[in-house]
Amino acid sequence: MIRRQKYGDEIAKAQVLIEALPYIKKFSGKTVVIKYGGSAMLDCNLKRMVMQDIVLMKFVGLNPIVVHGGGPEINKMLERLGIESKFVNGLRVTDEATMEIVEMVLTGRINKEIVSLINELGGQAIGVSGKDGRLLKAEKDTSNGDIGYVGKIVDVNIDVITMMLEKGYIPVIAPTSFGDDGKTYNVNADTAAGKIAEALKAEKLILLTDVEGILSNINDKSSLISRMDLEHAKEFMNSGRINGGMIPKLECCIKAVENGVKRAHIIDGRLTHSLLLEIFTDEGIGTMIGKECFDDDNL
């Protein structure tokens, strides 16, 4: 009894590792696409913890791919330059001046910061944009009217990503994309992550957000829906109970699962080590979406 009390903390840590074991075994060698954004990009401690999670995932045999946004940083830069930020259904209205700022912030600052932090923590990351190696081909998105240089992805060059994964690197992707018209397009990072996950037939697509997940009542944080099948997700999407930035998130999760991704997750990136909690624990922390009902596991 004395020894159990003395080593209580160590035993608890061992139990955590034991709980994670079946998940590590199941997901070894599998690809996980992570959309990194929201408050987890602004808080230095959270930023470091997210990257620690990603490096750990790599070390235990998963193949993480990071697709990042940068909305708050872009907003700050636009405000500094006196340019107003406008959104339609969660998508940024992007004129030529805004597109220049978006590309500068995403590829020139945020992408390199993420790569540097992963490398500092012992991983090996390579940062690219959707324009590099013709990774993400886009065309003008007019589904919400003309909102400028906003693109929808029409092709993903998976050879570029596969090459990095095979060499042991963690790809870090900024979602600025190229068009056959020679123009650069701003693609919503959630949508880009979903398209990349679809193209790779990834095991998981995980979107880090600033909410607990999908709530049945947006005013009640305890109303988290932990699991949804496709039918439920589509019904919820069409119910009008979500708005703003959650629209493209749920939409891309639905499309990803329809097109070969096994599970899509919307989780709270404000929580410490949220990625590890969602992937390697029995309960998970956010909303998981799959093709059919799941009864007894988080796999």
Curated annotation (Swiss-Prot):
GO terms for biological process: arginine biosynthetic process via ornithine; L-arginine biosynthetic process. The keyword Cytoplasm applies. InterPro entries: AceGlu_kinase-like_sf, AcgluKinase_fam, ArgB, Asp/Glu/Uridylate_kinase, NAGK-C. One of its GO terms (molecular function) is ATP binding. Its EC number is 2.7.2.8. It is found in: Cytoplasm. It is an enzyme of class 2 (transferase). One of its GO terms (cellular component) is cytoplasm. It catalyses: N-acetyl-L-glutamate + ATP = N-acetyl-L-glutamyl 5-phosphate + ADP. The record marks K35, K249 as: Transition state stabilizer. Substrate binds at G70, G71, R92, N186. It comes from the Bacteria. The keyword Transferase applies. Keywords: Amino-acid biosynthesis, Arginine biosynthesis, ATP-binding, Cytoplasm, Kinase, Nucleotide-binding, Transferase. Belongs to the acetylglutamate kinase family. ArgB subfamily. Catalyzes the ATP-dependent phosphorylation of N-acetyl-L-glutamate. This is Acetylglutamate kinase. It comes from Thermoanaerobacter pseudethanolicus (strain ATCC 33223 / 39E) (Clostridium thermohydrosulfuricum). The gene is argB.
